[in-house]
Amino acid sequence: MKPGIHPDYREVVFQDMSNGFKFITRSTIQTRETIELEGKTYPLAKIEVSSESHSFYTGQQKIMDTAGRVEKFKNKFGSRASGKVAK
């Protein structure tokens, strides 16, 4: 491998924001945040879903905030989202 052209492959902590679960793995992800875990400082990558919170792995169904998404869409696009296609 050529020196200086590859990203830094290092240990990183990934934190599931839905339940706080943290795990250490190796990654090339770039992040500014750090966290101290097990007496050592690691870069921190925040993720929305992991195997600890995804319904496929947990077997539990979670209700997502789809109503908030619909309202946000309606506020953003208003009458343009009437369903009619302009020709």
From Swiss-Prot:
Source species, domain of life: Bacteria
Example of a GO biological process term: translation
Pfam families: Ribosomal_L31 (PF01197)
Key word Ribosomal protein present: yes
GO molecular function per UniProt: structural constituent of ribosome
Coiled coil: none
InterPro entries: Ribosomal_bL28/bL31-like_sf, Ribosomal_bL31, Ribosomal_bL31_B, Ribosomal_bL31_sf
Keywords attached to this entry: Ribonucleoprotein, Ribosomal protein
Gene Ontology CC: ribonucleoprotein complex; ribosome
Keyword Ribonucleoprotein: yes
Family, as annotated: Belongs to the bacterial ribosomal protein bL31 family. Type B subfamily.
Subunit text: Part of the 50S ribosomal subunit.
Protein name, UniProt field: Large ribosomal subunit protein bL31B
Organism this protein belongs to: Burkholderia multivorans (strain ATCC 17616 / 249)
Gene: rpmE2
